[in-house]
Each structure stands twice: as C-alpha cells, then as structure tokens.
Amino acid sequence: MPDLESIVKDIAAEMRARPDRGAVASYIPELARVDAQGFGLVVIDGEGRVAAGGDADTPFSIQSISKVFTLTLALGMVGDRLWRRVGREPSGSPFNSIVQLEREHGIPRNPFINAGAIAVTDLILSGHQPREALGEILRFMQFVAQDDSITIDERVAASEKRTGFRNAALANYMRSFDVIENPVDYTLGVYFHHCAIAMTCRQLATAGLFLAYSGHHPLAGHSVISAERARRINAIMLTCGHYDGSGDFAYRVGLPGKSGVGGGILAVAPGKASICVWSPGLDAAGNSHLGRIALEMLVKRTGWSIFGV
C-alpha cells in the first residue's frame, strides 16, 4: 500500500496553489455563490484508514453524484426491469441535451445524464408519495455514508426548481412516451432534492466503499448489493460518469467515477479504495477541473488505474 497520507497531502497542497481552477456552475444561482478556491481530497480503504487533504470536511452540493445512489436503490427495487426505461450507452452529448432523447423515442441513453436520472427517480417514486421517496433516498445515503447527519440543502433544491426549465422539458418529453409514469412535478421535485444533498468528501468517500469492495460495505459490515451489480454499476460509471467528458476521464484517470456540477467527483479503485475529490471550478463538460487533475496525479502515484500501471 503506497503512503497515501503523504500522497494526498502533496496533491492537495499542489491543487490549492494552482491558478487554473475552472468556473463554478452559474446556471444554478446557489452554486454560483460557491468560493472557487475550495479543494478537498479523501481516500478511504477497506480497513477504514483515511487519507485526507484540504477541505475534506466542507459540505458541498453532490448534484449528479446522487445518481449513482439512486441507480443502486432503483435496481434494488425493480431489478433489471429498469433497463426497459433507460439505456446503458455513453451519450456523447451534454448532460441536459434533449436532441438525443427525441431521436430515441423518449428513452434516455444512460442513467447518469439528466433525463436518465429523472427516469430512475420516477421508478423510485412509483407507489410512494414524494416525501416518502425522498426519505428513502436520504436514508440510503446516510446508511452508506455511515452518517445520519447528512441533509438536503433546501436553498439549492429551490434554486434548481426555479431555473430547471430544461429538466422540466426532458421530463415532459419522456412523459409523452410513458417513460415517466408519475406526475412530472412530483418526479422533478424528488430529483431536484436528491441532487441538492450536501455531503463532505469524507462522507462521500465512505458512501462509495461498497462499490470498491464488490458490493460489500466494510464499515457497515455487510453487503449492500451483489458483486455482479457492483461490477455493472462501476462499468456504467466508467463509460458514462462524466457526461461528454467520460472518454477523456477514462483515458486520463482510468477509474470508474461520477462527477457533479457542484464540483465533486466520486471515484472507485476496485479492491483498493473509495475516493472523493471536490473543487467547484468546472471544465467545459461540467466536470471538476482540478478534481480530474488531482485524480490523474493520484493514480499515477498509486498505480491504481484499472488499465494497469
């Protein structure tokens, strides 16, 4: 095992000093207020050992990283029937694109673009009131993070609802094909709220441990999902986890991962560790600019890329 503590602290110090930080998300007003100078990095292994650097305990809006956990939850509820409503292919398009959805008759290309995550949220909502569905998602996040203090930032959720016209268009378009079955306002309400969950790098890295250890959560002491399902979720994270920057992330970092426009990236080194990095400045594809650079440095120094040293 490499000296993770030194590696993480070195990377955090280098990232804090860099001037090229990207631009914070401006289309969600609450996210536009975030200080672009923040940077945190946490690596947690199966023994519970933690290497942390920078703003490891600063909460941030997890945004699309929540889609990993809603996918996990929905698969637990409906199994492979989920794939009748959502595909498993990279989109190659921006995360909120409606063009592809129109071409493919309302079936989203994968569960990590906005349309796909809205369809997955609709599956979780079925048979529940919105408050119940949201409570189930939040309790699952608290369980895998082993922290009951995790909450939803209501200001971010309200900000997303006020400005989420493109997401409303996606949801209504899918409703016209019966891909969405519940009232659109209900589905979007749950979606906006789970994207507005606030977590720290330490909490998110803990939450991802079950994906790093074949579905078994070493800190919780039992399996969350089967090894096969963990492997398949990791595969989708690798191919689809960074919108139209997914191929570049696989090329540069070589780990399954999921980004969010709040500046976080959850990455998985199978059998080795769960990693979360946060830096709110984004690149052109909506992924954390310094977060990707930091992960590239981490895999070079640890040899953790799934494609080899």
From Swiss-Prot:
One of its GO terms (molecular function) is glutaminase activity. It is an enzyme of class 3 (hydrolase). Its EC number is 3.5.1.2. Belongs to the glutaminase family. Homotetramer. HAMAP family: Glutaminase. This is Glutaminase. It comes from Methylorubrum extorquens (strain CM4 / NCIMB 13688) (Methylobacterium extorquens). The lineage of its organism: Bacteria, Pseudomonadati, Pseudomonadota, Alphaproteobacteria, Hyphomicrobiales. The gene is glsA.
